[in-house]
């Protein structure tokens, strides 16, 4: 690589013989088996896969498709960057692609309701397949009626009508503050090139925007990497570890040059809140 810890005299000897000195070796946190499985599972779909180790922040797998062959990027450059090429293979969809979070955002809608209401377990709503406020209606998938549910059951069913009604119960300003704490509208704690996710809901936006946002639609945009970080924090008792992909650097003879250690970013939620969400996600 760009630097080497080969002994000085060895380097001089290599120079005199017209040979290149071996560089250091970088060992990543990527798990080959997981990386290969994620790559194959994504197939020909456009999308991304991110796998993290919650307790350390190690990035175990990261896939973005469509992809490209780095060995032939010079020859392929013109086709990769052509105006009529809609694949955007040079975009790392895992860290740079911004998408509506959809039902994954119900994690945060749930967390906000729990934080605002100590009696959250008592909330129930009878789903008839849709929820209407004024001229605006939110439908469940296939207009399915889920019946009477509590929060835990509605989370498991991913009931849009329930969550639209739940959203109307929230303090929008506090919801925005929660999303700020969850790193929306901010740089993620990573050295990777990553886009900022956005949460822009305001009280003045009205019921239609509030309902849509509560089910992960509306104007909210997020990267797959960001959502993986949030789920990782939930699985680590509310604590987010800084994600990293470099495990260590070794010299050409295998001597350890530098070891990268896990580092805590901060607490995103209480241990109790994380336990509730883990329970809901496993229901």
Protein language model regions, located:
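Structured loops at beta-to-helix junctions and adjacent beta-edge loops in soluble globular domains
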Residues: 1, 29-31, 218, 280
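Small/polar-residue-rich segments within soluble enzyme cores
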Residues: 1-23, 40
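Beta-lactam-recognizing serine transpeptidase/beta-lactamase-like catalytic domain environment
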Residues: 13-15, 55-103, 108-283
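Bateman/CBS regulatory modules and CBS-like beta-alpha motifs in cytosolic regions of diverse proteins
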Residues: 20-34
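Short coil/loop residues immediately preceding or within conserved phosphate-binding loops
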Residues: 25, 46, 90
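Small/polar loops that bind or transfer phosphate-bearing groups
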Residues: 30, 51-52, 167
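Short, basic/aromatic recognition patches
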Residues: 32-43
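Short N-terminal helix-loop-first-beta-strand/juxtamembrane motif that initiates sensory/input modules
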Residues: 44-53
